[in-house]
Amino acid sequence: MFVAQELRKKSIAEYLLYMWQIEDIIRAYGCSLPVIKKNYVDRFDFTPEQREEELDWFGNLIRMMNEEGKREGGHLNINKVILKDVIDLHGMLLQSTKFPIYNAEYYKVLPFIVELRNRGDKDLNEIETCLDALYGVMMLRLQKKTISPETERAIKEITTFVGLLSDYYIKDRTEGLKFEDDDM
């Protein structure tokens, strides 16, 4: 919970990736709060109050996963809503002439997105495809598996692009982005 709160303020992409990992952690522990407490939460150096807050947070996520039928897979609706907001912002940035750097980064990463979609779920949105790729590589690294140079290059470009989108998301939420010229 505490990590999620900080990530949500600084990088929405990192926040989503973290939340997807938390969903997987909950599943790995059988959606059982006592098992999560014993094998996961108790490993952290929390004060008693923090531990209680963390357990409440996990308990709420477990409840949502049960209610939404996400025990076996899929993302929680709270994460889907944020992803939709990010996807919507992506569309607005591409439509606007005020963000040429974003457009350039998008077209730089587009061949990688096309290749990933051809290999995987063709129905996924481009942004979700990018996040899935980042999550997949993160999991490979955690498992200390080898990542090919081609994949490393693609992930580097995707990371830059998604980082830029995350920065625009935070800026839009804090200051508001202007998508049109003032004289229109």
State what each model feature region is.
Residues F2-G73:
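N-terminal interaction modules that seed assembly of large macromolecular complexes
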Residues Q21, A28, D56, N60, ...:
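Charged, amphipathic alpha-helical oligomerization/scaffolding segments
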Residues Y29, T47, M65-E68, E72, ...:
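Short secondary-structure junctions and interdomain/linker hinges
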Residues L76-V137:
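A charged, amphipathic interaction segment
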